[in-house]
Amino acid sequence: MKLKNMKNKILFWVFYLMVSLVVAQTQTTTVIKDMVIKEPYIYAIEEKGTLRLWHTATLKEIPIAYDTQNVFTAIALDRKQNVVVGTKEGKLFYLSENGLQLFKQLKKPYTIQHIVFNSQNHPYLVIPNALYSPITDTYWTNFYHNYSPMIVQKRYLFFFKKRIKTFFLPPSLVFVDNNDVIWMTSFYGEFGGTLQLFDSKERKIINTPVENLKLGLFFPQSIFTDGKTDAVYIASGIQHIISSGDIFKIQHYTAEKILDDKDRPLDERLFIGASTIDAATETLYIATQKGIYQTPLPKSGCITNIELLCAPQLYWEREPLAMGAKMAIKKLFFHNGKLFFLTAQNGIGVYHEGVINYLNKP
């Protein structure tokens, strides 16, 4: 009995120390929410809403003058490569060496969560519970969900509720393809993911399902393109008891799995995260729990071999809706021979010629 009590005490203190370590790590780490690259600078916003700036060549931080009254919540490049930032109070600004210039102020102070631009350079915003066009002052919410990891209900006759399939789910990833289709997706741990499509040129919701894409087994980590074709690529991965991941190539609303981690032995499977393609060399870069891999992008068929490029040592946190960790790398960018990676807890990393540097160390 005494040994059992002692074992319980040891387990308690181990758990306590682990929780304390995670809390301390979270409290001392500056979290970068998003970033864009426009030569000669790297622009980033923190989770707490402040703006940061680094030089792409020297990787040194540069002081920037901006209105400290604003809480920045989104950042993007428009089609003319202007840096645009959104705020918690529903304001859009152009950002340049001359500071902030007000571009648009929403009629209501909705928090701007994501910003994208179509080929006509028209902005589309994700605000709470809607996709919104500030140009036409129009919003869209009626996206059809044949499958959803979330149960959404609508109240009727004051007291009754019924489950509905037409609604808007806030996405974690937003991407505009070469045909001006806005791809919005997110996932909810082991329960799978969602996909919402919108034609930004015709300004209408697309309810066409993507064939061969099972949303219950869909865990989107990034959306990207090869820079040459109309194909859309989505990296999907989760760590739930075991690591797993896939990369889909989608054309004409049909998904083809070009990387299937089930082809690997169980103990060698990879938790696939953010990915990107260097269009010049047609090289695919893939973030995993073991490091960043590279492989030639196949013209057709599946990826057969991947090579470990680098293995950054990163902090991680637990995935709340699965038995495992969150992906530590949120975004990958290949720019002028350097691989930039936006991390969840370690700021922005840069890999170049075998060396890793960090722009923001905890």
Task: Report each predicted region and the residues it spans.
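Repeated scaffold domains used in trafficking and secretory/extracellular systems
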Residues: 28-37, 69-78, 109-120, 148-156, ...
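Recurrent small/Gly-Pro-centered beta-turn motifs in extracellular repeat architectures
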Residues: 45-46, 87, 127-128, 184-187, ...
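Blade-level signature of beta-propeller repeat domains, shared across WD40, Kelch, NHL, RCC1
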Residues: 330-362
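Bacterial Sec-dependent N-terminal signal peptides
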Residues: 1-31
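Short coil/turn segments that connect the beta-strands within blades of beta-propeller domains
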Residues: 39-40, 80-82, 120-121, 179-180, ...
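Surface loop/turn motifs at the tips and blade-to-blade linkers of beta-strand repeat domains
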Residues: 26-27, 63-68, 104-108, 145-146, ...
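Structural motif
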Residues: 48-53, 91-94, 131-137, 190-196, ...
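Loop/turn-rich, solvent-exposed surfaces of beta-rich toroidal or solenoidal domains
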Residues: 266-298
